Curated annotation (Swiss-Prot):
This is Rubrerythrin. Homodimer. Possesses two rubredoxin-like centers and two non-sulfur oxo-bridged di-iron centers per dimer. Residues 1-150 form the Ferritin-like diiron domain. Fe(3+) 1 binds at E20, E53, E101, E132. May provide oxidative stress protection via catalytic reduction of intracellular hydrogen peroxide. Fe(3+) 2 binds at E53, E98, E132, H135. Its cofactor is Fe(3+). The keyword Lipid metabolism does not apply. It is found in: Cytoplasm. Residues 157-195 form the Rubredoxin-like domain.
Amino acid sequence: MKSLKGTKTAENLMKSFAGECQARTRYTYFSSTARKEGYVQISNIFLETAENEKEHAKRFYKFLKDDLQGEAVEINAAYPVELPTDTLTNLKFAAEGEHDELSNLYPSFADVADEEGFPEVAAAFRMIAKAETAHYNRFMKLAKNIEEGKVFKKDEVVLWKCGNCGFIWEGAEAPLKCPACLHPQAYFEVFKETY
């Protein structure tokens, strides 16, 4: 790959690295809020997504490290300030950020990388935008579940799994506490085997 030094692509990679690092940290904050509010599954999803963001940051940083080791890349960018409020607000805020990355930021950064002759970087931006699409969709579904009171209650009978002990409960609603380990309803999530 040719040198990134002095290119707009290098700036975009560093902006993306910084943005992904900040998203990761915000998601860990949001995870704590969700857990405190009794949404253990949503807390875990925020942590999982935070780890995904770390890997995105790593991918962007590796392009820079491989070519610009020991140098500084100056950027001028704005990043949102959103301290955790409540889980519903945090999910909507997170979805908004993911949507901006998948629909505006990363497609435009991919186009610049293509124009500057960095097809591998362009491909990375496009593939990571696809991952951000999954994050966006997941956050929106979780927000809708909270809004509709369907985190622990469904319209039909489903299997619920206690995230603490693995107990499986069948019903339209998760039990208020696990009959096996006595952990609260917060630990239940819809159970579906995907293997």
